[in-house]
């Protein structure tokens, strides 16, 4: 297969993309034309903040062509349909897309993840052979396995913040604790908590797809928990509240999350960069004294006990 690649201005990118799809290309993506250079301009921001850059000045439009398609003809047709300058048709290029078994290639990028010698995250395609270099085969087979495949919801165990929260649960979770996982994503933390001995476990997310993902993953792992949207969260306090989201939402949610922690209970927060730790901890200061429990690759896990 081949891709048609063309640089254009910000104002042209959307119209050209739509016209290319109408002309029959299989897919279109828009990238920063300066990607990988000093002029690259990241477009992102945490929830509650506006990205510093709203759009790239120079865009690279990449269109996947169907077999046998004439790229020049498709491009000219799209430019005309979008009412753009015909001169835009100059300067395009083609690049080959190698044939590949994309399912197998994707699976090869996700192997078993050891959180500790005891706790492992295992994709379904490694279900019968969770071998990882550095540990004896019998140690791997005796570990607690959480079966989880990458999907729409965040949380596969590979990100430092997920790893930090899992490590806390593995090391510190009180037996039988009532636990709230707020911002559950894939449900990985709630599922791990149940397998590690938590009692009643409630998983909450604002995204219905994440809630369904948690339900599905809990069924695969044969654990019982409740998964729901925030409005359905039952009343009451929890011995453990864990939230692996981002610093701005954590600050906004501080009164609610702190209020859900029972006296003597634990609050575990991640999704926080080292430079954000003091600010997030300060947001919880009226209710708990937070401290850094552990750091990993520039991210921290904050922990506090409610008096």
Curated annotation (Swiss-Prot):
| Chain residues that bind S-adenosyl-L-methionine | 162, 183, 205, 244
Instruction: Give yes or no: UniProt keyword Magnesium.
Output: no
Q: Which GO terms describe its cellular component?
A: cytosol
- Alphabetically ordered keywords of this record: Cytoplasm, Methyltransferase, S-adenosyl-L-methionine, Transferase
Instruction: Kindly give the Pfam families that the UniProt entry links to this protein.
Output: PrmA
Where is it chiefly localized? cytoplasm
| Gene Ontology BP annotations | methylation
Which EC numbers characterise this protein's activity in its record?
A: 2.1.1.-
- Give a GO molecular function annotation for the protein: protein-lysine N-methyltransferase activity
Q: Which family does it belong to?
A: Belongs to the methyltransferase superfamily. PrmA family.
* Function (record text): Methylates ribosomal protein L11.
| Official protein name in the record | Ribosomal protein L11 methyltransferase
Q: Which organism is this entry from?
A: Bordetella parapertussis (strain 12822 / ATCC BAA-587 / NCTC 13253)
């Amino acid at each position: 297969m081949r891709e048609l690649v063309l640089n254009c201005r910000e104002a042209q990118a959307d119209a050209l993309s739509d016209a290319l799809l109408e002309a029959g290309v299989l897919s279109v993506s828009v990238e920063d034309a300066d990607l990988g250079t000093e002029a690259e301009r990241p477009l992102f921001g945490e929830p509650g903040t506006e990205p510093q850059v709203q759009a790239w000045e120079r865009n690279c439009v990449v269109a996947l062509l169907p077999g046998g398609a004439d790229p020049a003809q498709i491009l000219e047709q799209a430019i005309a349909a979008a009412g753009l300058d015909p001169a835009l048709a100059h300067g395009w290029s083609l690049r080959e897309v190698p044939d590949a078994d994309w399912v197998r290639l994707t699976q090869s990028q996700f192997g078993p993840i050891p959180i500790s010698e005891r706790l492992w995250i295992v994709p379904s395609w490694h279900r019968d052979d969770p071998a990882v270099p550095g540990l004896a085969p019998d140690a791997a087979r005796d570990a607690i396995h959480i079966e989880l495949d990458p999907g729409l919801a965040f949380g596969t165990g590979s990100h430092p913040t997920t790893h930090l929260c899992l490590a806390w649960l593995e090391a510190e979770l009180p037996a039988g604790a009532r636990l709230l996982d707020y911002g559950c994503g894939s449900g990985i933390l709630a599922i791990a908590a149940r397998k590690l001995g938590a009692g009643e476990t409630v998983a909450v997310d604002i995204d219905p797809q994440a809630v369904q993902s948690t339900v599905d993953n809990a069924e695969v792992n044969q654990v019982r928990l409740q998964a729901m949207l925030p409005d359905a969260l039952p009343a009451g306090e929890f011995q453990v509240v864990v939230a692996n989201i981002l610093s701005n939402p954590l600050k906004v949610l501080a009164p609610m999350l702190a209020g859900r922690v029972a006296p003597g209970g634990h609050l575990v927060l991640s999704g926080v960069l080292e430079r954000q730790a003091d600010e997030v901890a300060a947001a919880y200061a009226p209710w708990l004294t937070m401290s850094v429990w552990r750091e990993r690759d520039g991210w921290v896990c904050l922990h506090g006990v409610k008096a």
